[in-house]
Design a protein with these regions (language model features):
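Bacterial Sec-dependent N-terminal signal peptides
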Residues: 1-26
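Pepsin/retropepsin-fold aspartyl endopeptidases
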Residues: 19-319
């Protein structure tokens, strides 16, 4: 049975500071234009090595998060977190909020990339149990604060990520690629795609989806976020994963097609979530769901955050 891992939609009830009011990540060697990082692909999720205050850790790279979250530390981990205070967090699920720690002015480095002024949220209990589910030690999640000053190329076949200084780099157009605009809202990338739904026969519906590399599923749709987004007749209710605020349930089914510009994917699996479950995910009121790694891994993916461009080229996973 496929391991269900959900790392979506962490919503902060308390925001004591503006996390972008800092210098952010940069190349230490400014003469270089590219940094290449190897990653492990486990259950569709990218696991990268990085250092926090010079301590080597393993983090999931999650484009669906705009914060750095640490949730698997033991008494033997000497990370040296700085400027700590208590905060309250709320995530997907219908349970209560949870207590966490907020730590400021930490140094995070990834090879030749570094920031000395990073905010980290520390969840005192490992609600996700990702290490147990994935079979390797996972210390946390790092989101778009690592990505949003760069253009990145993600190769799911070779398992490499290339970071480019966006101002010095323009992705070369290719005949077999599709280029789509993205919207970056509160540090999170959104894309408009088309879905063909059972409820509307052969008509395609435009939907706004979060590009979410931290979600192992193919596609999530929020029921009734548009009039015709409803669970098809044939479905089964399932546990989709665990959020900070409890278990996340939804209806699993298939839809006739997903269209990403020139690329059409027939009969993708879809999870339909109700409005109560997704209330904390709607930072963007026009959002209709998420595009997860089960779809993303079928492409070589270029994301240029500063220029708000996504480019896709199908790879050997595409079918």
């Amino acid at each position: 049975m496929k391991i269900k891992i959900i790392i979506f939609f962490i919503f902060f009830l308390i925001l004591p500071l503006n996390s972008k009011a800092q210098e952010g990540f940069r190349f230490l060697n400014k003469t270089k234009n590219k940094v290449r990082v190897d990653f492990k692909l486990i259950n569709n999720l990218m696991v990268i090595p990085l250092k926090i205050n010079n301590k080597e850790l393993a983090f999931i790279l999650d484009t669906g998060s705009n914060k750095t979250i640490l949730f698997n530390i033991s008494d033997n981990d000497t990370i040296g977190l700085k400027n700590i205070e208590k905060v309250t967090l709320q995530g997907l699920g219908k349970g209560n909020s949870v207590e966490a720690l907020l730590s400021q002015k930490n140094t995070i480095s990834l090879q030749n990339i570094q920031s000395e002024n990073e905010t980290i949220y520390v969840i005192l209990r490992d609600y996700f149990d990702l290490s147990g589910k994935m079979g390797v030690t996972i210390h946390g999640i790092i989101g778009n604060n690592l990505l949003d000053d760069f253009a990145v190329k993600i190769n799911y076949i070779s398992k490499k990520i290339d970071f480019y200084q966006s101002k010095k780099n323009k992705f070369k157009k290719c005949k077999k690629c599709s280029i789509l605009p993205i919207r970056v809202i509160r540090g999170k990338p959104f894309i408009q795609v088309k879905v063909k739904l059972d409820t509307v026969d052969k008509v395609f519906t435009d939907v706004n989806l979060l590009i979410d590399s931290g979600g192992s599923d193919a596609l999530w749709l929020f029921e009734n976020s548009k009039e015709n987004i409803k669970t098809p007749i044939n479905y089964f209710n399932d546990i989709l994963g665990e959020g900070l605020s409890g278990t996340i349930y939804g209806n699993r089914s298939r839809i006739p097609a997903l269209q990403l510009d020139a690329f059409e994917i027939p009969k993708p699996t879809v999870s339909f979530l109700d409005s109560l479950t997704t209330v904390n995910a709607k930072i963007f009121k026009e959002r209709n769901g998420s595009l997860g790694s089960e779809i993303l891994k079928r492409f070589t993916v270029w994301i240029d955050y500063p220029n708000k461009v996504l480019m896709l080229k199908k790879n050997s996973n595409f079918s």
